[in-house]
Amino acid sequence: MNLQESRRVLEELGHPVLALPEDSAGRFPDGDAWRIEIPSCEGPRVMAAVIDEASQRGVKIHRISQGSGVMMLTDAEIVEMVRLGREHDIEVCLFLGPRGSWDTGGQAKVSAAVGGVARGGRAVAASLVDAFRAVELGVNSLLVGDLGVLQLLDRLKSDGRLPADLVLKTSVLMPLPNGPTAAIYERAGATSLNVSTDLDLSTLGEIRAATTAPIDMYVEVPDDQGGSVRFYDVPDVVRIAAPVYLKMGVRNAPNIYPVGQHLAGTAEALGRERVRRAEMVLRLLAAEQKGDPS
């Protein structure tokens, strides 16, 4: 029994499931409605472990993202990640390192919502240094946690100092709870939007109606961002929010940022488990598509 069949049974029993928003007609350039993103891919060793696990499980990975920041990777590590990405057709998205939760201000310690901001002009300048360094080493996708930095990067793309096709992906640390906010981020230069982790399906539909950029959504949410596990929502998420990246967090796992050799084993194990989670989500999607009368 898949979800569609289960809903028909509930309706027969007098408990119909309320209608959801209309299907999204949006798609990625290749025509797909969804892609798989593995977050917290902290360096080439973790990326290699993720690729190995994906090969064993038959899971296609479209994007990996890294959270410790460009500043926490050596040039050689970045170059190796870019090489792995090209070899396996995976987008490599690196976080811009400076952020409020690592800075001197106490406010960032009391709310994760401001953890990704660049505090002051010095942090903004450092973010641009990270951006240019990553691009010079072959990276074509940046993970941005600050609205002002996002807009500056977009201006640098427009005047030719950064590549016109550079992906600017907003971080989950930039709250995105509604359509108007999504539209603001897109106008500021975002080309991929990480929505807030606790949104219902109707709100996702509103965000999709407000923007054409791909949506990124955690379907298992890290504990420090809410801890939801939403596997059974995924078929409806794809239907409503396409084009959408399905992100695999892992609950009951430590926050490993900034990662280093002292956490290498943990980071690799978490990367492999995220791929396993992706396999389970893909099984659900396949079951729903098999049962779709269309």
Question: What are the residue ranges of the model-derived segments?
Answer:
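Active-site pocket-lining/capping segments in soluble small-molecule metabolic enzymes
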Residues: 1-139, 144-176, 201-294
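Well-formed, non-transmembrane alpha-helical positions, independent of function
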Residues: 133, 181-184
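Acidic/histidine-rich catalytic cores of soluble enzymes
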Residues: 183-186, 203
